[in-house]
Amino acid sequence: MAGIKALISLSFGGAIGLMFLMLGCALPIYNQYWPLFVLFFYILSPIPYCIARRLVDDTDAMSNACKELAIFLTTGIVVSAFGLPVVFARAHLIEWGACALVLTGNTVIFATILGFFLVFGSNDDFSWQQW
């Protein structure tokens, strides 16, 4: 039952984060859809860590370096997702209010992604690795 509650709360967090992103795009005072490019970063962010978890053993000495590289790449993707709206706002493609809404959505979405890996990342029967 705890897994179901975690799944519901993670889906609620994802919906709230996407709501902030869409508010930053679709409100009539902003009306620019450039911030939707951060969706690519949402999709790309878990990929390096998922690949590293699949390819290496925990007993291998190389596994630590591979996981650290995956975490480094994931960090670069997350920092890019936070930097892109700021670059758009500095280039006057979007308003600063839209930038704030997108950054709030980024925080919620990446916290949701982190929560997913913390809840479902163990090697038990209720693991995301079986999906």
From Swiss-Prot:
Induction: Up-regulated in the liver of fasting animals. The chain crosses the membrane at residues 7-27, 32-52, 69-89, 100-120. One of its GO terms (molecular function) is identical protein binding. The keyword NADP does not apply. It is found in: Membrane. Belongs to the OB-RGRP/VPS55 family. This is Leptin receptor overlapping transcript-like 1. It comes from Mus musculus.
